[in-house]
Structure formats: structure tokens, C-alpha cells
């Protein structure tokens, strides 16, 4: 990495630790024309001693798509130009699903020109007017001086523009929390969501536990959800200044929903279900500084990689260790992340600039893995994680979202409740389409392969009423007096026009990650596909008699209990004891309800 650019953004990056500048910042000697007459030629390392740098630093050229916009300056635009700028801002906000980043003082080809103080002030004033016009808020993320070939101080300014889309109450991001038992997952979430530091004995996590045995043992055994909000100015909104989840939702323009998963190996099936069913945008992998990579840490890391869930790492409990111990744990993580099969670029976050950069790099490149070192007791570096979460944009683009919303309604049933005076309530994620209050849907498959009609009475997101649910959003749906006994986890609620198909036999292309001996016909495994979790038997291995660790094959599975709703292309994960494998569904043998009753023995 060029030291000039590193100094420009105050970034700090460990050797081999990846980039530390904002928006893929890099230096180029030749490449593109420069309107300010920057010299061309071979790039040099370092600054000129005792003088200004001659080689201008660059960002990558501006992309037409995405939520990042470069502007050299925005000084006194004409009315026509202003309207064009407003339209452009709407486009960038749409691309970022409510968030956009403006780089002021940067040309379209990425050249960091910078602006004098008066021009920067005028440009930010225009940006404020643009934001007001579209109903957005702006926050200055950082300012840095650009001092090559100029005696006049020049700056570039990075600005976050945030606007909650008209069809949403707030921006939403789901983060699954992984890590070994006793690494501090629930404690960290308690500190973030309650606004109070831990006392070193687990006080912060008590409000997160759902069962008495969890409080007694201090270990999570079930999936729980916690929320952290940010207002339009980037300030944290949590239970320290809000009594209820409803108040947090009302005060926030962005919501982070943490999915707290179990760390103990005994509850691994619950952790896998949380990753496959709740469709997290990304995952937070917690590693204790004093134990390093231990227990289920590697297994959880492998799950995130297998399911292609982007993840970042938090090294906790740094207050318990010497600095050398923390550094050893970070080096251990960096070695694992760079190994074949992982191929990640670790980036150690040590400053607010690093946190801003990490959020942008993480969204743009799936290979970048930010690493935070913090303490839930002393609060050390906790603010850096909050900055990262505030700036982190949605990881799916607007086009993908629009395509999903154009499809027919499909809602995954992950949880089932009975609420007094409300009736049966189901919780889950809308995989595709749009769901409204009063919609008529069908739910299934039942044990005998049927789909039953029902009506959506009301919808809630984060305990707040919601009239419309869109693809990718998680919510609870009230079903009135629908019989709870007819429902189970793994079902789907779909539009009647979809004419859903079910199967008891399906084929998948798999990779056997580990098996002690040979994987043969007749072997039984627990299959996870989305919110489906059921025991299946291997009926056939195509073109082979057996499989060994690391081998690939197309395998035919048969569910043992009841038929399921599966789609071709869905990611698949199976396990039984130490046996593990991943793959995707390649074919489903559709059957009718009558055939299901015959084949499943009803």
C-alpha cells in the first residue's frame, strides 16, 4: 500500500492486513486524465522529504451503479443544475436502499483534488439543500487534507446521506452473532443494546436470556433477537434512553437486529437453523482474546463460509489480557483468514477512520474481513464497532430487492406463538413478494402434504405495527383463530397463485466436508435447507458407490417424516455427529398430497 495514501486518510493497517482507506482508496501514477494538471508517470512510494508530494492520490473511478457519488464541488449551482443534482441523489439513495456516500473534492475519475475552506463550506451548504429537497439527513463522516503540489490547504470531505424510503419505517440490517461458548456474545449484545458496560460477571447479558437454565449457566441455548437503533445523525438509540422496542423503532432511522445464536456444540443444530432460516445480511464472529480460536469457533467460521454469509470479527475481553496476548490472537485469526478455502483479507480496525473504511470495504468486497478488538467491561474500542454498524450499508442492491418484490409472496415460518386476545402468531422472513394485512395465503405442507388457506390479520416488525411487508424483511404475522396445532417450523406461507409443489425425494450436488470413514447409501443425516430441518436418508450416490472427505457427487435424499417445500438452487447443509457436508439442490421430485400420503405412510 502506498504510504502517501495511508497518511492521507490516517489509516493504519497491519502488514498483510488489507486496505485501510475509504472507498478502496489507492494511488495511481498514470491512469485517466487530470483536469488539475496532475503529473503523469510512474508512481513513487512515499512523500518527498521536506516538500509536497508530486504524485496525486486517487480513488477508483466513480461507478455508475452503487451508492457512492464523487463531486469536485457544488458551489452556487443553477436551478437546472440543482434539480439534476437532486435527481442524482435520489438515484444514489435508491441504489443504497436509503443510504449514499458523497465524496466532496473528488473528480469523477477518482482524482483527489480537494477544496479550499470557502469552496468546501459552499459545497456542503448545497448538499444540505439537496438533502432537504429529498427529505434526507446528512452526516460528515470525515475530513482529510490533500496537500500535494499546493500551498493552499485543501480538503476532501466524506458525507453520509440517509433517507428512510417512503415505503419503510426504518432501514434494517440483520446480524447473526457467532462464536464459541463463553466468548462474550450475549454480554456484548447486552452492552450495545442496554447502553451499560458489564461488571465483569455477566450482568449485561441477563436481560437477553429467555430461560431459567440460561441465567443459571450463563450459556445461550435458544435463538434470541436484540435491536440497536441509530438516528439520522448517527447517534445510538437503545434501551438506555428508550423504555420499549416501539420507542427505539420510532426514534431510529436505521435498525440493527442482532440474532444471538448458541455457542455450545450441544446446540449446534439451533445455530445452523438461525443461519439458514433467518437470512442474516452478515455475521459477527466473536473470539475471546484470552483463548483465541477454540471450541466451536472454527466450526462457526466454516458455517459462515459454507453459507456465503459475509462476516466480521470481534476480539473480546481485551481487558483480561496483556497486549501481547491480544496481538497473538489477532495474528492467529489473520493466518486462518488467509488460508486456502477462506481467502479473506483481514483488516484490523484501530481508529474511527478505519471503522468508516472497513464498513465501505466490507460492503464492496466479500473478501475483506474487519477485525475489532474491544472490551465489554472497560468499553475500550466499543465506539469503533458502533461507527462501523452505523455506516454499514445493506449488502443487497436495489435491483435484487426489486426483482424479489416482483415475485409471488413466500413467507418462511420460523417461529409459532399463541398470544392472548390475538390468537396464533407466526414469525419468520418474507423470502419474496409483498405481504399486506388481509391477504389470503396458503400454508404448508402439512404432514400429509396439503396446503391450508388462511388470512393475515395483522403484521408487526420489531413490535411495531406494519401494514405492508416487503421481500427480505422479518416480521410476525397474526393469523387469528387458525389452529396452531396445524403449523410447524419449516412450513411456508405462499400466494395461492404459486401452486406450490412439495417433495419427499430430492437431489443435491454436495461436497463432503468431513466423514470418519466412507459415506454410503443408507446413511442418515439431518438436512438444513432454508428453514427446513429434517432427517433424510441417502438413497443413491450418482456414478459412485461411496464418498470420502473432500469428494463431490450428486446425491439423492429422501425425507423420513413428511414432505417439504424445496426450490432448485437452494443452499443445503447436512450433518450427523462429526459428518458434515454442503451443497445445493439440483432437482426435486414433485408429488401431490395423495402421493405424499402414500409414500410417507399416512
UniProtKB/Swiss-Prot annotation:
UniProt keywords (A-Z) are: GTP-binding, Nucleotide-binding
What residues does the tr-type G domain cover?
Answer: 170-398
What the entry lists under Pfam families is as follows: GTP_EFTU
* UniProt-annotated stretches for the region Disordered: 18-64
State if Plastid is listed as a keyword.
no
Membrane-spanning segments = none
Q: Which GO terms describe its molecular function?
A: alpha-aminoacyl-tRNA binding; GTP binding; GTPase activity; identical protein binding
Q: Where is there biased composition of kind Basic residues?
A: 40-50
Q: Where is the composition biased (Gly residues)?
A: 29-39
> What tissues has this protein been observed in?
Predominantly expressed in thymus, spleen, and testis. Expressed at lower levels in brain, heart, lung, kidney, and skeletal muscle. In testis, specifically expressed in spermatocytes and round spermatids.
The keyword Glycoprotein belongs to this UniProt entry's keyword annotation: no
Copy out the induction comment.
Answer: Up-regulated in thioglycolate-elicited mouse peritoneal macrophages.
Which residues hold GTP? 179-186, 260-264, 316-319
Gene Ontology biological process terms in this record: nuclear-transcribed mRNA catabolic process, no-go decay; rescue of stalled ribosome
UniProt lists the family membership as follows:
Belongs to the TRAFAC class translation factor GTPase superfamily. Classic translation factor GTPase family. GTPBP1 subfamily.
PANTHER family given in the database record: ELONGATION FACTOR TU-RELATED, GTP-BINDING PROTEIN 2
Can you say what this protein is called?
A: GTP-binding protein 2
Gene coding for it: Gtpbp2
Amino acid at each position: 500500500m502506498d504510504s502517501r495514501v495511508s497518511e492521507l486518510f490516517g489509516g493504519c493497517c497491519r502488514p498483510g492486513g488489507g486496505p485501510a482507506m475509504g472507498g478502496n482508496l489507492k494511488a495511481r501514477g498514470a491512469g485517466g486524465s487530470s483536469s488539475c494538471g496532475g503529473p503523469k508517470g510512474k508512481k513513487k512510494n512515499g512523500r518527498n522529504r521536506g516538500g509536497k508530494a508530486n504524485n496525486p492520490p486517487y480513488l477508483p473511478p466513480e461507478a455508475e451503479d452503487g451508492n457512492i457519488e464523487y463531486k469536485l464541488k457544488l458551489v452556487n449551482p443553477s436551478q437546472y443544475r440543482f434539480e439534476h443534482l437532486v435527481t442524482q441523489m435520489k438515484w444514489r439513495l435508491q441504489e443504497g436502499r436509503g443510504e449514499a456516500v458523497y465524496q466532496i473534492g473528488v473528480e469523477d475519475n477518482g482524482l483527489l483534488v480537494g477544496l479550499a475552506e470557502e469552496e468546501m463550506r459552499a459545497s456542503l451548504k448545497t448538499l444540505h439543500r439537496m438533502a432537504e429537497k429529498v427529505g434526507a439527513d446528512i452526516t460528515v463522516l470525515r475530513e482529510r487534507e490533500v496537500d500535494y503540489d499546493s500551498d493552499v490547504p485543501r480538503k476532501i470531505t466524506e458525507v453520509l446521506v440517509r433517507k428512510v424510503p417512503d415505503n419503510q419505517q426504518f432501514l434494517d440490517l440483520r446480524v447473526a452473532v457467532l462464536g464459541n461458548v463463553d466468548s462474550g456474545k450475549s454480554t456484548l449484545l447486552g452492552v450495545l443494546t442496554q447502553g451499560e458496560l458489564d461488571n465483569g460477571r455477566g450482568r449485561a447479558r441477563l436481560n437477553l436470556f429467555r430461560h431459567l437454565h440460561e441465567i443459571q449457566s450463563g450459556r445461550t441455548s435458544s435463538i434470541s433477537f436484540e435491536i440497536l437503533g441509530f438516528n439520522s445523525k448517527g447517534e445510538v438509540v437503545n434501551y438506555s434512553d428508550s423504555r420499549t422496542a416501539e420507542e427505539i423503532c420510532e426514534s431510529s432511522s436505521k435498525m440493527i437486529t442482532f440474532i444471538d445464536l448458541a455457542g455450545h456444540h450441544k446446540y449446534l443444530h439451533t445455530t445452523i437453523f438461525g443461519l439458514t432460516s433467518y437470512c442474516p445480511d452478515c455475521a459477527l464472529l466473536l473470539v475471546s482474546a484470552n483463548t483465541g480460536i477454540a471450541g466451536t469457533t472454527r466450526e462457526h467460521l466454516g458455517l459462515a463460509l459454507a453459507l456465503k454469509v459475509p462476516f466480521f470479527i470481534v476480539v473480546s475481553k481485551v481487558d483480561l489480557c496483556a497486549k501481547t496476548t491480544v496481538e497473538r490472537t489477532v495474528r492467529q485469526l489473520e493466518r486462518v483468514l488467509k488460508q486456502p478455502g477462506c481467502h479473506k483479507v483481514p483488516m484490523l480496525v484501530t481508529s474511527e477512520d478505519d471503522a468508516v473504511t472497513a464498513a465501505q470495504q466490507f460492503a464492496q468486497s466479500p473478501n475483506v474481513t474487519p477485525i475489532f478488538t474491544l472490551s465489554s467491561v472497560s468499553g475500550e474500542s466499543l465506539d469503533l464497532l458502533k461507527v462501523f454498524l452505523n455506516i454499514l450499508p445493506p449488502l443487497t442492491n436495489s435491483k435484487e430487492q426489486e426483482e424479489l418484490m416482483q415475485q409471488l409472496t413466500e413467507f418462511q415460518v420460523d417461529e409459532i406463538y399463541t398470544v392472548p386476545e390475538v390468537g396464533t402468531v407466526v414469525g419468520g422472513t418474507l423470502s419474496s413478494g409483498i405481504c399486506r394485512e388481509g391477504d389470503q395465503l396458503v400454508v404448508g405442507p402439512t404432514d400429509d402434504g396439503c396446503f391450508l388457506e388462511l388470512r393475515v390479520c395483522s403484521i408487526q416488525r420489531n413490535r411495531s405495527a406494519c401494514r405492508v411487508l416487503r421481500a427480505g424483511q422479518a416480521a410476525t404475522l397474526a393469523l387469528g383463530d387458525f389452529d396452531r396445532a396445524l403449523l410447524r417450523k419449516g412450513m411456508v406461507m405462499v400466494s395461492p397463485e404459486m401452486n406450490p409443489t412439495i417433495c419427499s425425494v430430492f437431489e443435491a450436488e454436495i461436497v463432503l466436508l468431513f466423514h470418519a470413514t466412507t459415506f454410503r447409501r443408507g446413511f442418515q443425516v439431518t438436512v438444513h435447507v432454508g428453514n427446513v430441518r429434517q432427517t433424510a436418508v441417502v438413497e443413491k450416490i450418482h456414478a459412485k458407490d461411496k464418498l470420502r472427505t473432500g469428494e463431490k457427487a450428486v446425491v439423492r435424499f429422501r425425507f423420513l417424516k413428511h414432505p417439504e417445500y424445496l426450490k432448485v438452487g437452494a443452499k443445503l447443509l447436512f450433518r450427523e455427529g462429526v459428518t458434515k457436508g454442503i451443497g445445493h439442490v439440483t432437482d426435486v421430485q414433485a408429488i401431490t398430497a395423495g402421493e405424499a400420503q402414500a409414500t410417507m405412510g399416512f
